[in-house]
Amino acid sequence: MGDPSKQDILAIFKRLRSVPTNKVCFDCGAKNPSWASISYGVFLCIDCSGSHRSLGVHLSFIRSTELDSNWSWFQLRCMQVGGNANASSFFHQHGCATKDTNAKYNSRAAQLYREKIKTLATQATRRHGTDLWLDSCAAPPASPPPKEEDFFASHASLEVSGATQASAQPEPASSTPWGLETTPEKHEGGPGQGPSVEGLNTPGKTAPAEVSSIIKKKPNQAKKGLGAKKGSLGAQKLTNTSFTEIEKQAQAVDKRKEQEDLARGTPKEESIVSSLRLAYKDLEIHKKQDERLNLSGQKKAEAERLGMGFGSCRGGISHSVTSDMQTIEQESPTLAKPRRKYQEDPEDSYFSSSSKWSEQSSSRYFDDPMELRSSHFSSWDDSADSYWKKDSSRDPEPATKSTGSSDRPSSRRKPEYEPVGNTDEAQKKFGNVKAISSDMYFGIQSQTDFETRARLERLSTSSSISSADLFDEQRKQTTGNYNLSNVLPNAPDMAQFKQGVRSVAGKLSVFANGVMTSIQDRYGS
């Protein structure tokens, strides 16, 4: 016995898949299963087929119904005698309703069903051999091939059938002319005359000629079925109606539509006119309010800009802001002097002097802004040099006043020297000397030498000394008495750095004053 061909396999599985119970998976119920268990003759999905493979071939032998082509006749008979419906009924009869794959196919019911499928497939193979279909599943009856329809033959058959129907019912069709012929004879003749019998001698060929049309049959059939009911959808006979009246009615309807359109258009025009009237009234109200308030030009502009006192005031109840509006002009402000947190050295007194100069310049700037602006921006390059000359002549006080210098010890404190009143004495005293020092000029050389010798003699017995011991300074200085000279290092380049800072600060102050004046001129007035 040879193996089945591919066409035989496809034909058998096509027939088996057409069964509704075989269109879903036997285990999970998924649609369109493409795998099969030969041991049980059931159809499975690809996921359930994997779980069946893990059970082993001794429990379930899996094959694909689409990919595998080496099926044997015994395997095909197993699928034919099995099926999802037979397997489910057998398992239910034996009380196996579990969903667990291992428990289900290792049960006693699964073992009995495997043996049953094997026995039935062996018997079918011996009995039918290589036949495709078994007795239980015979081949479906072959449907006859569709015949080609002839268009002209079909129309000819319709005409023949219509003629036979007309000839089959000659009596109802011929009764109508006979009745029409007898009625006038009754009116024309007397009551003794009988009906005419001329139509009886004529052959029956004339009747089909008069009743051959299908249109005359329909009223007779409609009368039989529907009768003379009111509101029917059948055709009605036209009475004597005048078309002039219909035309007049149509014209009346057209005129009515035109009138409705005109009536709809008038409210729109009225609404437009009313809106224009309201706009004019609003303008008149605003004009009256302006006349009543008597606002000047500047106050009116400010009121319009702020949106106050127009349209929202209720007469005699609410308060109008414009009645109490006053124009406030800014006077020259007095700038408060900032408090100094730290004390300064005479060397660093520039910052205090520059602040005073900026205050004076700002006040003078506000008094005459145009003159100062032109003077500042015309002499931009020379402003720093001229400023320092003015500063030295205008504000000499910070150079001599220093609040923190009194807290220093007498040894390191810079003494307040008074210049020699008479310059002739200095010229007489140092006229022939090539070089002199400040100590020689002020006569303090002997005093400093005496203090230094006394201090060294006092510390001669000590093993080590410090700078604080040498100059009699206190160990700890108070936190509030720090000076800028104690913070900044005493380096030779610090003088140049201070000079650069002073020049930059002067230029920035001049530029800031010019900017502030331009802003106040533009936005202040």
Swiss-Prot record:
Top-level taxon: Eukaryota
Stretches of the chain forming a coiled coil according to its record: none
GO cellular component: cytosol; Golgi membrane; photoreceptor ribbon synapse; presynaptic active zone
Biased composition (Basic and acidic residues): 293-305, 387-398
Entry-linked InterPro entries: ARFGAP/RecO, ArfGAP_dom, ArfGAP_dom_sf
UniProt cross-references to CDD domains, sorted A to Z: ArfGap_ArfGap3 (cd09028)
Region (Disordered): 160-233, 249-271, 293-364, 377-428
Free-text activity regulation comment from the record: GAP activity stimulated by phosphatidylinositol 4,5-bisphosphate (PIP2).
Name of protein: ADP-ribosylation factor GTPase-activating protein 3
Gene: Arfgap3
